[in-house]
Amino acid sequence: MTLVTFIENLTSTVTEIGWSLFILAWAIGWALRGSPIPIFRIKRGGQDLLEDAIIAAFFLAIGSTIFYLISYIASQVS
Protein backbone atom coordinates (compact mmCIF):
# COMPACT_ATOMS: atom_id res chain seq x y z
CA MET A 1 0.00 0.00 0.00
CA THR A 2 1.47 3.29 -1.06
CA LEU A 3 1.06 6.58 0.69
CA VAL A 4 -1.29 7.86 -2.01
CA THR A 5 -3.70 4.91 -1.76
CA PHE A 6 -3.61 5.12 2.03
CA ILE A 7 -4.52 8.82 1.94
CA GLU A 8 -7.28 8.20 -0.63
CA ASN A 9 -8.76 5.32 1.39
CA LEU A 10 -8.61 7.29 4.62
CA THR A 11 -10.15 10.33 2.97
CA SER A 12 -13.06 8.42 1.49
CA THR A 13 -13.72 6.53 4.72
CA VAL A 14 -13.70 9.65 6.90
CA THR A 15 -15.89 11.51 4.42
CA GLU A 16 -18.44 8.68 4.22
CA ILE A 17 -18.65 8.43 8.00
CA GLY A 18 -19.00 12.19 8.34
CA TRP A 19 -21.81 12.48 5.79
CA SER A 20 -23.58 9.48 7.35
CA LEU A 21 -23.50 11.15 10.76
CA PHE A 22 -24.75 14.38 9.20
CA ILE A 23 -27.73 12.62 7.62
CA LEU A 24 -28.48 10.79 10.87
CA ALA A 25 -28.37 14.00 12.93
CA TRP A 26 -30.48 15.79 10.31
CA ALA A 27 -33.15 13.07 10.37
CA ILE A 28 -33.27 12.87 14.16
CA GLY A 29 -33.39 16.66 14.42
CA TRP A 30 -36.36 16.93 12.07
CA ALA A 31 -38.09 14.01 13.79
CA LEU A 32 -37.80 15.69 17.17
CA ARG A 33 -38.64 19.16 15.90
CA GLY A 34 -41.69 18.01 13.97
CA SER A 35 -42.98 15.56 16.55
CA PRO A 36 -46.41 16.20 18.04
CA ILE A 37 -44.98 16.14 21.56
CA PRO A 38 -46.09 19.24 23.50
CA ILE A 39 -42.79 19.47 25.37
CA PHE A 40 -40.89 22.51 24.13
CA ARG A 41 -37.55 21.23 25.39
CA ILE A 42 -37.64 18.22 23.07
CA LYS A 43 -38.54 20.39 20.09
CA ARG A 44 -35.72 22.80 20.96
CA GLY A 45 -33.34 19.83 21.15
CA GLY A 46 -34.36 18.90 17.61
CA GLN A 47 -33.73 22.46 16.47
CA ASP A 48 -30.29 22.38 18.10
CA LEU A 49 -29.49 19.12 16.31
CA LEU A 50 -30.49 20.68 12.99
CA GLU A 51 -28.32 23.73 13.56
CA ASP A 52 -25.34 21.59 14.58
CA ALA A 53 -25.84 19.32 11.56
CA ILE A 54 -25.79 22.28 9.18
CA ILE A 55 -22.59 23.65 10.71
CA ALA A 56 -21.03 20.18 10.64
CA ALA A 57 -21.95 19.76 6.96
CA PHE A 58 -20.26 23.06 6.14
CA PHE A 59 -17.04 22.07 7.89
CA LEU A 60 -17.24 18.57 6.44
CA ALA A 61 -17.42 20.01 2.94
CA ILE A 62 -14.42 22.23 3.61
CA GLY A 63 -12.49 19.40 5.27
CA SER A 64 -13.18 16.92 2.49
CA THR A 65 -12.04 19.50 -0.06
CA ILE A 66 -8.78 19.91 1.83
CA PHE A 67 -8.38 16.12 2.13
CA TYR A 68 -8.87 15.64 -1.60
CA LEU A 69 -6.46 18.48 -2.33
CA ILE A 70 -3.82 16.78 -0.15
CA SER A 71 -4.52 13.50 -1.91
CA TYR A 72 -4.12 15.16 -5.30
CA ILE A 73 -0.86 16.82 -4.30
CA ALA A 74 0.46 13.53 -2.88
CA SER A 75 -0.41 11.71 -6.12
CA GLN A 76 1.40 14.35 -8.18
CA VAL A 77 4.50 14.24 -5.98
CA SER A 78 4.78 10.45 -5.94
Curated annotation (Swiss-Prot):
Induction: Up-regulated upon UV stress. InterPro entries: CedA1_arc. Its main location: membrane. It is found in: Cell membrane. One of its GO terms (cellular component) is plasma membrane. The chain crosses the membrane at residues 12-32, 53-73. It is a multi-pass membrane protein. Coiled coil: none annotated. This is DNA import protein CedA1. It comes from Sulfolobus acidocaldarius (strain ATCC 33909 / DSM 639 / JCM 8929 / NBRC 15157 / NCIMB 11770). The lineage of its organism: Archaea, Thermoproteota, Thermoprotei, Sulfolobales, Sulfolobaceae.
